């Protein structure tokens, strides 16, 4: 643990429990940034060959994380851009105009899908906060043979609540629809195996649990689907040989077909170290540590009478514990002033990662409970 913690300078400055918002950044990034600057000062066009190879190395790391075959991951600046590119592959004026999502998604999903109504997309937003129906059952009930795909978050960005992806994949595939999973809030802290879970598309990004840079997102697409998907939102990079600068006659044969313009090289370069560190630890070990940490938070806050918005069941709980009480935003700010970094999104979110200790969690909870009592 000490050696791992030494990789992240922020841990020497505070109690950092905010990896669901932005993960701790490895110290190796400074070296990578310097090397990048040096390459720019002695530019040669051949640098692009090295940089595209670096992008493919990052893709390979994400594929390893997902248990995915080679050539099934592509990166871009944001998950929104990649979801838009995927959504642009469909003719919504044909027999499958419907897209289903939930009221638990990060706002970008709804923004994008509603905007595509002009192309014939019919959006249905399922209420998964009902007391009378499990979220998976509510989503399954909304699917039919007119559904092109369903977009769900593996873990809620607000509470960390997990969905059963295998159950949702069965429900989607039973009606001929595809399952698209936003895993931004789970990858790196909760295992996701695209083969075992039978998912079709996974979206994620580097700067949260994967301890990387902003402006780097990625999308996995099931290999068997690749040849059937032709994005309308595309660009010069979406070929097998973009550096030939030839007029495009065909999309790339692999996930590179979801490229667009000039790719996000620097974010991938500085994000590689964080991804490598986490792969070295292994997601199973990270998940075990995360569950032990979040169980500690749930038990302590529950004993204090604090309302917990995160599901208490381990198999329903992602990497976040979300707390709901009057004055929680002010308490979050006072925690920050005292050197305990958490986040607030309508609830106070505590998000321990593999580099956090029980002692740090206890110290944060001591302060949180004291601040809450003082505010009552």
Task: For the regions a language model picked out, list residue spans one by one.
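Pyridoxal 5′-phosphate
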Residues: 1-376
